[in-house]
Regions:
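Aromatic- and charge-enriched surface segment that lines or borders ligand/interaction sites
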Residues: 80-145, 176, 311-313
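Ligand/substrate-recognition segments at binding pockets and active sites
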Residues: 366-434, 500
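Ligand-site clamp/hinge motif
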Residues: 241-285
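Periplasmic-binding protein-like
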Residues: 308-357, 361, 389, 483-492
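N-terminal lobe/hinge region of extracytoplasmic solute-binding protein
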Residues: 35-85, 218
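Long beta-strand-rich cores associated with HINT superfamily self-processing modules
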Residues: 502-527
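Extracytoplasmic/peripheral linker and loop segments enriched in polar/acidic and small residues
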Residues: 404-417, 442-506, 527
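Gly/Pro-rich hinge or "lid" segments in bacterial periplasmic/extracellular proteins
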Residues: 158-165, 172-173, 178-252, 262
Length: 527
């Protein structure tokens, strides 16, 4: 009897063990690793500029809206909203259960200041954050996203006080925003860091250090800024007190510094990292079967002219230089539109300056006459990866134009190249224009007069009007017309397309990016 009992007991143990071993492994509460090539300079969402700065912001903050996998804005801090019949007034009813996460570092900072703050996220926090982004002293890189707000442009120029902004707090949980013009892209703007909430009391307590370290930032999203190891990594951890619709499944995400994107590619391949974006040589990296790749044609390698330079601001000169280049013959993956193909715009009716040597020569002669010169030295600056491209362009100019033109190619380290671009110390540059918005009108707005990203210093009232009209009422025909305007005026010469490769380890799921790498979301990540 005892032997039978022991035998039965062993069978039961084996069955239980079998079921236990067959139990599905828990894929939640895991830690994820992402490779970066540049450490964030700060964590202030209103002035977030780099890919990683924006990525950390969209994961640690809840804006009024959040982008889903289809790039569509979904209600986030907003419980309900309505838009007036004329499309100019937005009224948002906010959730009443949102709170800022107060980390141990922030607690220590507040204790040092002998004060406390209201953890509730209310309408005035969103109003303060948005108005901050309009102020000239904030110098928000993405101010343009909010420029349709009533009086935004005058406030940004310092012509009006911020109290005149079309942003009104009705009560703690009702916010009203009035626009000066209709903006089809406005809900998208409210998914971006530039519009995120900012607690005024905490902001003022930091005395100019807001967002510079983990103790100087509070956020209301599914993650919070946990630690910063200078020149090594940044870690965001799950906000266990979060009550919104986008609760974090993973325990946290680490952003780890690498020398090149090739290093990131190798680490995603060997499983050190879960996900990464690759550029340049990393795209050619042979990745193993454990990695799923997606390629985005989101970079337009272009020849750009500096309109602040007295020579290249001459319209005839630019037309001459552009008209003697046959991009279809000289470059692989030639691009005949200002927009990269990422946007899926029908550009079949786009108008460009055709390759025409006689036309190029006549315009150059006209330019020489207008500039009152007989010879011309013109410099193209570029980084080493585009040296051959620059030499091809110079050879075309010197061979085809037939006037006294001397093209000079100056190859620079990336840091020196960027310094010259920012300081307007260039005539012509080979520059990668990269998608940083899901909307063609935002991409095209980088050519508008007051846009922070207008490295060409191009100023055209007519083009500004065209982009505003496009934002008011979007349409393929208008997108094409805007591009044609830039191309026919030789503001930019698109040369060829480049791709960004998004790779994720096949064991990871739930990570998604809504259009561009800065809008990558980790809250649903599992492995």
């Amino acid at each position: 009897m005892i032997k039978k009992f022991i035998a039965l007991f062993c069978v039961v143990v084996m069955i239980v063990t079998c079921f236990a071993s067959c139990k599905k492994e828990d894929t939640t509460n895991k830690f994820f690793a992402y490779g970066i090539t540049q450490m964030p300079k700060h964590f202030d969402p209103q002035i977030a500029e780099s890919e990683v700065e924006k990525m950390i912001a969209v994961n640690t903050f809840d804006g009024l809206f959040k982008l889903d996998e289809n790039k569509t804005p979904q209600k986030c801090a907003v419980k309900d909203y309505k838009i007036s019949n004329d499309g100019l007034t937005y009224t948002f009813e906010l959730r009443d259960d949102m709170n800022y996460y107060i980390s141990g570092d922030v607690e220590d900072f507040l204790e040092e200041k002998s004060t406390t703050i209201n953890k509730n996220v209310v309408a005035k926090d969103f109003a303060f954050g948005i108005i901050r982004a309009l102020l000239p002293e904030t110098d928000a890189p993405d101010y343009e996203l909010l420029s349709a707000i009533k009086n935004a442009e005058k406030i940004h120029k310092g012509e009006l006080n911020s109290s005149e902004a079309g942003v009104k707090v009705i009560n703690d949980y009702t916010l009203e925003i009035t626009l000066e013009r209709k903006d089809s892209n406005f809900l998208y703007a409210l998914t971006q860091p530039v519009s995120f909430p900012c607690n005024q009391q905490f902001f003022e307590l930091t005395a100019g250090r807001y967002g510079l370290d983990e103790e100087y930032i509070i956020s209301n999203g599914g993650f919070y800024l946990s630690s910063i190891s200078e020149d090594k990594n940044v870690v965001i951890n799950k906000n266990t007190e979060y009550k919104g619709n986008f609760a974090a499944i993973p325990s946290g995400v680490g952003f780890y510094l690498n020398a090149t994107t090739l290093d990131i590619a190798e680490k995603v391949d060997d499983g050190t990292y879960d996900v990464g974006f690759f550029y340049e040589d990393a795209e050619k990296q042979e990745l193993g079967r454990s990695v799923v790749k997606t390629e985005l044609k989101n970079i337009a390698c272009s020849l750009v002219f500096n309109m602040a330079d007295k020579t290249t601001q001459n319209n005839a000169l630019r037309i001459g230089l552009v008209s003697c280049v046959d991009i279809s013959k000289d470059f692989e993956n030639p691009l005949k539109s200002v927009l990269p193909s990422y946007y899926n715009v029908d550009n079949s009716k786009i108008e460009t300056l055709a390759y025409n040597i006689d036309f190029a020569r006549s315009n150059m002669l006209k330019a020489f006459d207008e500039l009152k010169i007989k010879t011309l030295d013109i410099e193209i600056i570029c980084t080493s990866e585009y040296e051959n491209t620059a030499k091809t362009l110079v050879n075309n100019w010197q061979k085809n134009i037939g006037v006294e033109l001397n093209g000079i190619v100056t190859v620079l380290e990336e840091s020196d190249f960027n310094k010259r671009i920012v300081s307007d110390d260039f005539q012509v540059a080979i520059y990668s224009l990269t998608v940083d918005s899901n909307n063609p009108s935002e991409y095209l707005s980088m050519f508008t007069t007051d846009n922070e990203k207008n490295i060409m210093n191009y100023k055209s009232d007519e083009f500004d009007r065209l982009v505003k009209d496009l934002r008011n009422s979007p349409g393929n025909e208008k997108v094409v017309y805007c591009q044609s305007y830039l191309l026919k005026n030789a503001v930019v010469l698109p040369l060829f397309e480049e791709t960004t490769t998004y790779a994720v380890n096949k064991d990871a799921s739930g990570i998604y990016f809504a259009g561009d790498s800065s809008n990558m979301y980790f809250y649903k990540a599992q492995k």
